[in-house]
Amino acid sequence: MVYNGHEMEVIFMDINLSSKNEIIIKNEFSYLIDDIRRYRQDLHRIPELGFLVYKTGAYVKEVLSKLDCKIEPLVNTGFAVFFDFGCEESICFRCDMDGLPIEEQTVAFYASEHEGCMHACGHDGHMANMLGFAHLLDKYIREKKALPYNALLIFQPAEETIDGAEAIVNTTVFEDYNVKAIYGLHLWPMIEKGEIASKPGPMMARSTNVKVVFEGKSAHAGEPEKGRDALLAACEFVTKIYDYKDNFIRERSILQFGKMESGNVRNAISPYTSLDGTMRTFNDLTWAKIVNAMRNIADDIEQNIGVKVDVDVSQWHPAVVNDTSLYAKIKYALKNLDFVELRRPVMIAEDFSCFEQVLPGVFFFLGTGTGIPLHNDHFDFDEDVLLNGIKLFDTLLKTQLSTCSVDIGS
């Protein structure tokens, strides 16, 4: 998950995280808490990166092998898990599996055993939540419980490296199981413990990588007139972009540069400078406006300073845009949960958006109430919040989308 920590604080700054953070969450699925706590802590110890989630996948499959389900390999280390309730259509639930290249600084007894790698984005919790849900589905099958849909669970690698979701979309898994809709969730530190949040329409930003390269001419620092200063051109570019920032705010967008590389020695005009940054937007028009602004500024700098400027943009994720029709159908059922509707979208990006390009989908946040940001080396949470995640998935599976009814008591 790609995000801007300050933006997350701004969006949720009016929430008093201390008010519910000390509660212990209990619901009708509390009998699963020992299992999901063990799963989460075991998985937290063995974080792996990208598609290289071999230990993680083996652990999850070992748990699932004891349940009445079909495990099907997908791309690379990803896999699908099918619970057959004899229905024509299926509902899909997705979780991510990979960790981050972060050295853990918690003192938890279940801290990462893999040096330089940590589950700092809660994917261990997402998997534990899904395994708890799988236990519930297995129970329903043993009880021969009638449900409106089959359940397809997707365990996705490489969310952090942006490859996983797109690779799965390019398979035929959704057609093979006649999937009607897809749901997912993400642990969220900036809302109350156990609270579930979502919204119709745009929820999370489109993420675009931006790289700007400046090519000038080297010269001695004592004779700057003989060179063309790429570093000066880069500074001019950033200054002009930041002068344009009021437009970004009006358009609900961000353009932020966080990395600069230039020169090799202190006493020479730099012939080469590069800037790396990120852009967050919610629609194509705003995206095009910002890209055009960067290219216009680049043209001005080329003419005024004589440095060649190349602006390269490459998309990471499209925006997470929850299907408004699907959201309207499930919203009634969500009233039985600790649910709140987000006021506005967030600038964080998530590759769940790739699934929403091909299926109606809704994404949710599940509050940890800690206030510790994602991608932080102290990230942690209480596993009891996952009980509400299981309840959410159970409610969604039982919601009959054609009639908008749900068997809440079952």
List PLM regions with ranges.
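Acidic/His- and Gly-rich active-site-bordering loop/insert found
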Residues: D14-H119, D124, A128, H135-Y149
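Non-cysteine beta-strand/loop elements that form the S-adenosyl-L-methionine
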Residues: C92-R94, E103, V210, F363-T368
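Histidine/acidic-residue-rich, glycine-tolerant segments that coordinate divalent metal ions
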Residues: L100-I102, V107-M118, D124-G125, Y140-S270, ...
